[in-house]
Design a protein with these regions (language model features):
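Extended, compositionally simple hydrophobic/Ser/Thr-rich segments
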Residues: 1-4, 43, 50-53, 58-177
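Secondary-structure transition/turn motif
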Residues: 36-44
């Protein structure tokens, strides 16, 4: 699991079994932090790896495969892009101007906080639990068997296809459905 927090300084801490610590790699490429196991080594029989990262600003989150990300503190953002695919999961509290979410596969997201503009694109069997995410304006595209729950107070523009489901709380002005 990757735990992220917003702090004044940058830092990273890795907790794992002693036998895999030497094979855990961290690198920053093009401003992106990558955490992975050395691909040239086959490791069997280890328990979960936990990584804690602190940073002052976060702009992008990308969780794939069976990756798990949890916010250990609320984040204040101008614009945040979250991409979750495969069986990836994201649990985060955010406050800010704009949050864009793209979720596919069996991705699971649990978001809370306050956002002015929320752009949501979901497909396959992705799910969003966002009852505690208070959104002013929402633009949602949901397809496949994806399901989203969100609280909207201002304007809603939605395109739902296949067996997609959008459940919203509030009384938004619907401009497209």
């Amino acid at each position: 699991t990757l735990y992220i927090s917003q702090g004044k300084t940058e830092g990273i801490t890795v907790e794992a079994d002693d036998n895999i610590i030497p094979y855990i790699k961290t690198e920053i490429k093009n401003g992106q932090l990558n955490i992975f196991l050395d691909p040239e080594v086959i490791i069997r029989g280890y328990t979960a790896m936990n990584v804690s990262v602190s940073m002052p600003v976060i702009t992008d989150i990308n969780v794939a495969a069976a990756g798990r990300l949890e916010g250990s503190s609320p984040f204040t953002v101008n614009k945040l892009e979250i991409v979750a695919s495969g069986a990836g999961s994201v649990k985060l509290e955010v406050k800010g101007s704009e949050v864009d979410v793209e979720a596919s596969g069996a991705a699971r997201l649990e978001l809370k906080g306050e956002v002015e503009q929320f752009d949501l694109e979901m497909s396959s069997a992705a799910t969003l639990k966002g009852w505690e995410l208070r959104v002013k304006n929402c633009d949602a595209e949901i397809s496949g068997a994806a399901k989203a729950e969100v609280s909207i107070s201002g304007q809603l523009e939605a395109e739902i296809s296949s067996a997609g489901i959008l459940i919203y709380d509030g009384n938004p002005r619907i401009t497209k459905q």
